[in-house]
Amino acid sequence: MASYDLVERLNDTFRQIELELQTLQQALSSCRLLAARVFELPAVSKDAEHDPLANIPVVQHSGKAALALALRHYSHLFIQQQSENRSSKAAVRLPGAICLQVTAAEQQDLQARIQHINALKATFEKIVTVDSGLPPTARFEWVHRHLPGLITLSAYRTLTPLIDPSTIRFGWANKHVIKNLTRDQVLMMLEKSLQSPRAVPPWTREQWQSKLEREYQDIAALPQRARLKIKRPVKVQPIARVWYASEQKQVQYACPSPLIALISGSQGVSVPDIGELLNYDADNVQYRYKPEAQSLRLLIPRLHLWLASE
C-alpha cells in the first residue's frame, strides 16, 4: 500500500502541474499569434479502443481557432472534459503547431516555464510508476482513487517548444516496440506466470496453465543461443519534421500535442512555413526507407514473441 506521504506528493505535484499549465496558457495567450495549424483527429470510442487504425481522417483548424484548441488541449487531463462515449484509454491527440512572436526575454521565460512543467510531469510519472512500488495492473486503481477520471498519459505527456524553426512538416509514423531476449529470459517470464496460476478468459485456470506449460516446453526446446525478440506494433503516431535553417539541420519530434514555436527573429525567421497533415491510409503508406525485413517466425502470438533466423 502506498504511504500517506506518497499520496500527498502525488496530489501536490499534480496541483502544481495544473497551476503551471494555467499560468503558461495565460502567458502564451498574451503573445502575438503569427500562425497556427492544428489537426483534429476523430475521437476513439470505448468499443474501438483496441482496434488497429486503418484510416484516420483529419480536420484542419487554423489561426485563432487553432490557438484556442491548442491551449485547451494542454489542460485536457480528465475524462470529465470529454464525451462519455470516448475511450479513456486511447490517447487524446491534437498534432499541429502554434507560432508566437516573442522578445528574447519572453522566449527565455516561456522556455523556463515549459521546462518546469515537463520536470513536474516527469516527477508525477515517477511517483506513479516507480515510487508507488505498485505493479502496472494496480496503478490505474490507485491513481484514480486519488485523482478520479485522470487521463494518466495526458498528465505524463510533455510539451515541446521550438526555437525559431524555419519549416514544420507533419506526417505519420508506423513503429514497433522491439526487445531482444535470450531463451533463458523468456523461460523466466513464463516460469513466473506458471507460479501464479489464474484464469484468463476465455480459458479456465486449468486450460491457461496447460497453455503456459506448452509455451514453456516449446521455448525450452530451442537452442540456448536462439535469438528471440518481442516485436509489438504501436498504433500509428503523428510526427513533425522541423527544419532549422540557421543550424542547417532537421529534427523529428513526436507530435501528440501542438508544438509551441517561439519566434524571436534573432535567427532571421519571421513566420515559419507550416505544412499540413494528410489523412492516414494504411493501404497507401509510402516509406522513406524500409530496410530488408529479417526472417522471423512467430512463436507466442500473445507475447508478440518471434524467433529470428540465424
From Swiss-Prot:
It comes from the Bacteria. Keywords: Cytoplasm, DNA replication, DNA-binding. It holds the Pfam family Ter. It is found in: Cytoplasm. GO terms for biological process: DNA replication termination. Trans-acting protein required for termination of DNA replication. Binds to DNA replication terminator sequences (terA to terF) to prevent the passage of replication forks. The termination efficiency will be affected by the affinity of this protein for the terminator sequence. NCBIfam families: rep_term_tus. This is DNA replication terminus site-binding protein. The gene is tus.
